[in-house]
From Swiss-Prot:
Co-factor remark: Binds 1 [4Fe-4S] cluster per subunit.
Catalysed reaction equations from the record: formate + NAD(+) = CO2 + NADH
Signal peptide segment: 1-35
Full protein name: Formate dehydrogenase subunit alpha
Lineage, uppermost ranks: Bacteria, Pseudomonadati, Thermodesulfobacteriota, Desulfovibrionia, Desulfovibrionales
A Gene Ontology biological process term: anaerobic respiration
Any one GO MF annotation of this record: formate dehydrogenase (cytochrome-c-553) activity
SUPFAM superfamilies the UniProt entry points to: ADC-like (SSF50692), Formate dehydrogenase/DMSO reductase, domains 1-3 (SSF53706)
Cited function: Alpha chain of the formate dehydrogenase (FDH) catalyze the reversible two-electron oxidation of formate to carbon dioxide. FDH loses activity in the presence of air, but this activity can be restored. The alpha subunit of formate dehydrogenase forms the active site.
Covalent S-S links between cysteines: C852-C879
GO cellular component, one term: periplasmic space
Cofactor(s) this protein requires: [4Fe-4S] cluster; W-bis(molybdopterin guanine dinucleotide)
Length: 1012
């Protein structure tokens, strides 16, 4: 047998390693034999490439599958992949065991109302029965007109959550099917992890995505890691952090705990969880006072010069326009003064007393070091060191980046946490540049893609706003969401909204005209929230009858888990689609549950793991990467895409036979676009639909399209309904040239190679642009501010941009006739320092978490975010002596999310077998707790046990003259498995949320800790 190079290297490496250990006197003969056998097995195996299914770094995998058994025999890192270069974290390295796992249910499971056990059922019985339940509940709860007489065509009785664990193509048909049924309660992981990111970055820059990409971290001069712990939670990203350090970059970590990330940093500063805005606003004050801002950038690329209207005011933590009864702002008070053409008035000297720059100087003057230190618990000298180091990147040839995650997002001020740093990055000129950006570390393999494809109640794919009751016609819908600008230098890219919305609607109902098809879309009630916390509150109140939990475990993942679990008992039926049984599917047999009293009918559908199916996922850096089938789905598991297709076809058949209320959206849904000639899910056909194709012949400029031809770029989409595009930002991903996401070409120009763009490896949205807002990396004539790491440059002789795909094809801004401004997704073309579109203020303001250890703070008399989402029936602990300690949740390297997949993977479970609570030595002494003791953590909402870990890595904080203790717990556990592993951390967390997105505040709440 010929041994290929890769197998030969494996054999020799294994032999060398085992020889070394053999020299220690250890008998390694069995291990040698096993290693040799495994290496030889992979030589003749089918080899496919895939992408890791855990965090959103997007590491490449090579999967070896036995050709005879069609089972995986080995999964390893792909050495050719430019992100991970063959390396994997513990979770990625365990992928083989995830697939080849005896704990995966072999067949669908059914739990009858009142039953205390599962029973196996056939797939046909399950799918037919679920389809019947869907059709029956839809008919019973379908609202054609609301109380005002407005046509809404909405199904109020069914909700669905999930899933960032699905491929893009599965996500798209999933949302299409749900919306055809009339669902508005559509939510998934993004709401409770990074919804704050989208709202903050879209307000600041125009798009809600990570601005740069993982490899680009190596180009940074200073990396600030705050609200994140990348060394443990995104380990392969840290490869690129260390590349930057090797080149001389300064690494900074600001975090409540001293972690593995901290150990590699030049500066570590402790900070009380929930006090980030004070720290970041202090940095803004420092930049402004010391004049460390990049003035040309601030004047030319931001709205610093915009003059704010006379209605703006701010006093004691409240902006103008606040209504105490409704707890909302009249945001018109925050608007800009405008000229006769409707364009904002500007003062480029930045001297006008009401220009944004001057308003900012006034707003931030309160944030002095003494107050910041007193509320954050961070020593003043460390605050100054962080500010000095990071603000040095305000020079044209320097770049600083921020890496953040749940530590910023999961707060009632989550959006403003991110806005605060977004503002600092603009002041320092760090947006659009190599080594800069605001980089959101997403924690689900495809949470970027699932959000792009509209798996949330408020957006359709491509971030198109959803329809509401007050928008009865398609014409009014496009008018509402299409901004108008008369500024000739503003690209105002969202003016193309009608092209994108028409193409989306036509992807679902190509045979209906736009007005008719728009009528099929469900219309939410104006002013009503349908997001995660409200969804489960409505379920708790018995308003929701049927529920899909698709690739998600809300009984553990949502805030106030006891409330969520109780809400599930109020359902008529629930469908749980997952790889393993879990706390959601089996809620009826969980703690404090009496199955006999629970009437919820439960259907558990076992699905395929990532390496068992084909399709694309999009990582945090917006790279859309194609995965191929390795092993077949284990036993009788079925891929999500096929499940969606089967359910959609069955419901269509039922409604075709007995139409009931408005059957047309379901029966006319073009499911033919989803399947191959055999009627099975076809990821390639759906990827082509997402890209978009011509429905009839037409011409754009010199480009002619024939009906059925793939659209090359979203600039060619049409507003008249002659094109499809399931998600306009993905147009260009699957063209007549083929599947761009499947590309593996590492060729680069010298300019691209300097910063590691890899434009031929897979495809990035939009239009394969790797660093968004990149025209802000050059001066007004198109010359790079940092020539040694240029992203784009204007070639005046050839009249074109070189380097990355420019963020807009126009000439530089100095060309007053043809040039356009850099931030094309904002109406005026400028990035927003001052953002009047958010619910809680145009500038970040400090507020305490809804549960906190203080009754006042030094910045204003307003303690909490006055617009935060909360429920009047739920108690909160503010300076409550029963709950004296701050608690925060976090992750460990070996587990992922609620632990549903990793707790069922023996290698990983062995490393982190049960719930623990980290606490300081001082707190342990105070409570008489020793290392390894069992302790009880209790909040207003519930209690759980954990094993105590006493550590020097957590220290008490000095907060306003008093000592405040903090404890930390991982959120990966649940009662169902393993036995004695502990329960969900979210039993303790509050159902309160950010007013912009409803993301829950699970990173700062109050508990008591006692020895069990």
């Amino acid at each position: 047998m010929l041994i290929k190079r890769r197998a030969f290297l494996k054999l020799t490496a294994a032999g060398a390693t085992l020889s070394a250990f053999g020299g220690l006197g250890v008998d390694l003969a069995p291990a040698k034999a096993q290693a040799a056998t495994m290496a030889l097995k992979t030589v003749d195996a089918k080899q496919t490439t895939s992408v890791c299914c855990y965090c959103s770094v997007g590491c490449g995998l090579i999967v070896h599958t036995d050709k005879k058994t069609n089972r995986a025999i080995n999964v390893e890192g792909d050495p050719d992949h430019p992100i991970n270069e063959g390396s994997l974290c513990a979770k990625g390295a365990s992928t083989w065991q995830l697939a080849e796992n005896e704990r995966r249910p072999a067949n669908p499971l059914y739990r009858a109302p009142g039953s205390d056990q599962w029973e196996e059922k056939s797939w046909d019985w399950m799918l037919d029965t679920i389809a019947e339940r869907v059709a029956k509940t839809r008919e019973a709860t379908f609202v054609t007109k609301n109380a005002k007489g407005q046509v809404v065509n909405r199904c109020d009785g069914i909700a669905s959550v999930g899933s960032a664990a699905m491929d893009n193509e599965e996500c798209w048909i999933y949302q299409a099917w749900l919306r055809s049924l009339g669902l508005f309660y559509i939510e998934h992981q993004a709401r409770i992890u990074h919804s704050a990111t989208v709202a903050a970055l879209a307000e600041s820059y125009g798009r809600g995505a990570m601005t740069n990409h993982w490899i680009d971290l190596k180009n940074s001069d200073v990396i600030l890691m705050m609200g994140s712990n990348p060394a443990e939670n995104h380990p392969i990203s840290f490869k690129w952090v260390m590349r930057a350090k090797d080149k001389g970059a300064t690494l900074i970590h600001v975090d409540p705990r001293y972690t593995r990330t901290s150990t590699k940093c030049d500066l570590y500063a402790p900070l009380r969880s929930g006090s980030d805005i004070a720290f970041l606003n202090g940095m803004t004050k420092y930049i402004l006072e010391k004049e460390l801002y990049f003035k040309d950038y601030v004047v030319n690329y931001t709205n610093a010069s915009f003059i704010v209207g006379e209605g703006f005011a701010f006093e004691e933590g409240l902006f103008a326009g606040y209504n105490k009864e409704t707890r909302k702002y009249d945001k018109s008070k925050w608007g800009f003064e405008r000229d006769e053409n409707g364009n904002p008035k500007r003062d480029e000297t930045l001297k006008h007393p009401r220009c944004v720059f001057q308003i900012m100087k006034k707003h931030y003057e309160r944030y002095d070091l003494d107050k910041i230190s007193a509320i954050c618990g961070t020593p003043k000298e460390l605050i100054l060191k962080v500010y000095d180091a990071y603000c040095a990147t305000g020079k044209p040839d320097k770049a600083g980046t921020i890496m953040y995650a749940m530590g910023w997002t999961q707060h009632t001020v989550g959006v403003q946490n991110i806005r605060a740093m977004s503002i600092n990055q603009l002041l320092l000129g760090n947006i659009g540049v190599a080594g800069g950006g605001v980089n959101a570390l997403r924690g689900e393999a495809n949470v970027q893609g699932s959000t792009d494809h509209g798996l949330l109640m408020h957006i359709y794919p491509g971030y198109l706003g959803t329809a509401r009751a007050s928008i009865p016609t398609y014409e009014e819908y496009t008018k509402k969401f299409t901004p108008v600008s008369k500024d000739p230098q503003s690209a105002n890219w969202w003016s193309n909204f009608p092209k994108y919305s028409a193409s989306y609607i036509k992807s679902m109902w190509p045979d209906a005209d736009l007005n008719e098809a728009y009528g099929y879309l469900p219309k939410g009630e104006d002013g009503k929230d349908y997001s995660w916390l409200t969804l489960f509150d409505d379920m708790f109140q018995g308003k929701i009858k049927g529920f899909f939990a698709w690739g998600q475990n809300p009984a553990c993942s949502g805030a106030n888990s006891n409330k969520t679990r109780e809400a599930l008992t109020k359902l008529d039926w629930m469908v749980n689609v997952n790889i393993f049984d879990n706390e959601t599917g089996s809620f009826w047999r969980g703690p404090d549950m009496d199955p006999k009293k629970i009437k919820t009918e439960v259907f558990f559908l076992p699905c395929a793991v990532a390496i068992e199916k084909e399709g694309s996922i999009s990582n945090s850096g917006r790279w859309m990467q194609w995965r191929y089938v390795g092993p077949e789905p284990r036993k009788n598991a079925i891929p999500d895409g096929d499940l969606i297709v089967e359910l959609a076809k069955r419901v269509q058949k039922l409604l075709a036979k007995t139409p009931g209320k408005l059957a047309a959206p379901v029966t006319k849904l073009k499911t033919d676009y989803w399947v191959n000639d055999h009627g099975h899910f076809d990821p390639h056909k759906i990827a082509k639909l997402i890209n978009g194709f011509a429905l009839k012949d037409f011409k754009v400029g010199d480009v002619e399209y024939k009906a059925g031809q793939q659209i090359a770029t979203f600039g060619h989409l049409q507003a008249d309904g002659s094109t499809t595009s399931g998600c306009w930002i993905y147009t260009g991903s699957y063209t007549e040239k083929g599947n761009m996401a499947a590309r593996r070409d590492k060729t680069q120009t010298d300019m691209q190679a300097k910063i590691g763009l890899y434009p031929g490896w897979t495809w990035a949205w939009p239009v394969n642009r790797r660093i968004i807002y990149n025209r802000a990396s050059v001066d007004l004539n198109g010359k790079p501010y940092a020539p040694e790491k240029a992203v784009v440059e204007w070639n005046a002789a050839e009249k074109k941009w070189v380097g990355d795909v420019p963020d807009g094809p126009w000439p530089p801004q100095a060309d007053k006739e043809k040039g356009k401004r850099a931030f094309i997704m904002k109406p005026e073309g400028y990035a927003y320092l001052y953002g009047p579109g958010r619910e809680d203020g145009p500038l970040p303001e400090y507020y305490e978490p809804m549960e906190c250890p203080v009754i006042e703070h030094p910045f204003s008399k307003t303690l909490h975010n006055p617009t935060a989402l909360h429920f009047a029936t739920e108690e909160k602990a503010v300076c409550d002596p029963r709950y004296p300690f701050i608690c925060s949740t976090y992750r460990v390297t070996e587990h992922w999310q609620t632990g549903l997949m990793t707790r069922n993977t023996p290698w990983l479970l062995e490393a982190e077998p049960q719930m623990f609570c980290e606490m300081s030595e001082e707190l342990a002494t105070l409570r008489g707790i020793k290392n390894g003791d069992k302790v009880i953590l209790e909040s207003v909402r519930g209690k759980l046990w954990a094993k105590a870990i006493i550590t020097k890595r957590i220290k008490p904080f000095a907060i306003q003259g008093q000592q405040v203790h903090m404890v930390g717990i991982p959120w990966h556990y649940g009662w169902s498995f393993p036995k004695n592993g502990g329960d969900a951390a979210n039993i303790l967390t509050p159902s309160v949320g950010d007013p912009n997105t409803g993301i829950p505040e699970t990173k700062a709440f109050m508990v008591n800790v006692t020895k069990a």
